[in-house]
């Protein structure tokens, strides 16, 4: 069941306990960021807040974010992640610099490939609000295994976000604790570099085909062999 929380003016967090989505309500339309797992009834949760027409934009194409797309049929998603989406969905491109205005928010699209090749963040510079999808988290785990992920790109994207950190006040990840501060960008980066350099001990995940790496701040599910 999705729990809906009004976090700021016109800004709602829709959370099923495993992943969260974000709904912004304006005067004439609403904006939904991500759609959750398949079968989560995200449309019902949105309709409980507003009856406005809804546009959908995506932080990335993983199943736990794109699973509710059939309830809407259309979204904006970075082209690099189109192959992750199945079903009869009308996909429109999403790229660096695309801006979405709704309900007093101005969300700028920032490409941050790594967690997936098509990962993006949405950033409201005036409010200092960053919606990074899965790419910035407190503790983790951050998934970095599989053919649609790239650790080198993830590291470069974290560096890109670090350049914005002075203006960021609030980060709301799609998983685990929220809100968090901009210091977690640097913490995730520090541990990602350590993982790349082979400095983190790893243990086999008991259920998934990956290795669990635990850094100083962040846990990653990555490639490689257990140490």
Predicted segment positions?
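Conserved beta-strand hairpin/beta-sheet module of binuclear metal-dependent hydrolase folds
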Residues: 1-48, 121-133
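A general structural motif
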Residues: 28, 51-53, 168
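Active-site metal-binding loops of divalent metal-dependent hydrolases
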Residues: 34-37, 60-61, 105, 115-116, ...
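Active-site HxH/HxHxD metal-binding segment of metal-dependent hydrolases
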Residues: 37-108, 138, 191-198
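A general structural detector for well-ordered alpha-helical segments in enzyme core domains, enriched
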Residues: 42-45, 154-157, 161
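Conserved SAM-binding loop
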Residues: 112
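A short alpha/beta connector and helix-capping loop motif
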Residues: 143-158
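Accessory terminal helices/loops
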Residues: 159-227
């Amino acid at each position: 069941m999705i729990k809906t929380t009004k976090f700021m003016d016109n800004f709602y967090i829709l959370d099923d306990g495993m992943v969260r989505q974000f709904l912004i309500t304006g005067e004439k339309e609403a904006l939904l960021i991500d759609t959750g797992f398949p079968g989560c009834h995200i449309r019902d949760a949105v309709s409980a807040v507003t009856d406005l027409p809804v546009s959908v934009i995506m932080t990335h194409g993983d199943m736990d974010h794109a699973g509710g797309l059939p309830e809407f049929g259309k979204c904006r998603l970075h082209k690099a992640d189109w192959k992750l989406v199945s079903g009869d969905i009308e996909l429109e491109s999403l790229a660096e610099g695309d801006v979405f205005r709704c309900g007093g928010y101005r969300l700028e699209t920032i490409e941050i490939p790594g967690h997936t090749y098509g990962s993006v963040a949405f950033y409201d510079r005036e409010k200092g609000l960053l919606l990074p999808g899965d790419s910035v988290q407190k503790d983790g785990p951050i998934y970095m295994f599989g053919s649609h992920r790239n650790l080198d790109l993830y590291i470069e994207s974290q560096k890109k976000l670090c350049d914005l950190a002075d203006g960021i006040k609030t980060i709301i990840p799609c998983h685990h604790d929220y809100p968090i501060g901009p210091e977690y960008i640097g913490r995730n980066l520090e541990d990602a570099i350590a993982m790349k350099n082979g400095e983190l001990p790893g243990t086999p995940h008991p259920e998934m085909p990956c290795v669990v790496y635990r850094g100083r701040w962040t846990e990653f599910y990555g490639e490689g062999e257990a140490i």
